[in-house]
A protein has these predicted regions:
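Surface-exposed beta-strand edges and their flanking turn/coil or helix-capping segments
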Residues: 19-21, 55-56, 67-69, 82, ...
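Short S/T/G/P-rich N-terminal loop/turn motif that feeds into the first structured element of a domain
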Residues: 1-34, 39, 50, 89-107
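An amphipathic, aromatic/His-enriched active-site/gating alpha helix that lines ligand/cofactor pockets
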Residues: 58-84
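Short, well-ordered beta-strand segments in beta-rich or mixed alpha/beta enzyme
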Residues: 4-9, 44-67
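Residue-level "edge-of-site" marker
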Residues: 46, 84-85
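A short linear hydrophobic-aromatic micro-motif
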Residues: 37-44, 79-81
Length: 107
């Protein structure tokens, strides 16, 4: 499965609702991901540009796109981005492939 990082900023309305009735959203996030065949790796709540960060594994980019669309449609976030991440093994493989590309294109 591929690894993805999802970052989002809550709307003022969503943040106000959370302040009024604090709830742990991790289980809801986990359940939503599992519904589409994805698996939660870690969730964090940074302060700064984004309010929530979710790292998850999904079978493909289409699944990751469906997660982002579902969150956007719920209207709870004002901005978000999904980043496809390489695993350590994928990173190493890309470094090795780069040598092949470089050697073929070297002057």
């Amino acid at each position: 499965m591929a690894l993805y990082m999802y970052q989002a900023s809550y709307t003022a309305k969503s943040m106000a609702a959370q302040l009024k009735e604090p709830q742990d959203p991790v289980e809801a996030i986990r359940s939503a991901l599992e519904d589409v065949g994805a698996e939660l790796v870690v969730t964090g709540f940074p302060f700064g540009e984004y309010d929530v960060l979710v790292v998850y594994e999904a079978p493909d980019d289409v699944t990751a796109a469906s997660v982002a669309m579902a969150v956007a449609a719920a209207g709870e976030v004002k901005s978000a981005k999904t980043t496809r991440m390489l695993s350590g093994q994928e990173w190493l493989e890309s470094l090795r492939k780069r040598r092949v590309v470089h050697s073929r294109n070297a002057p």
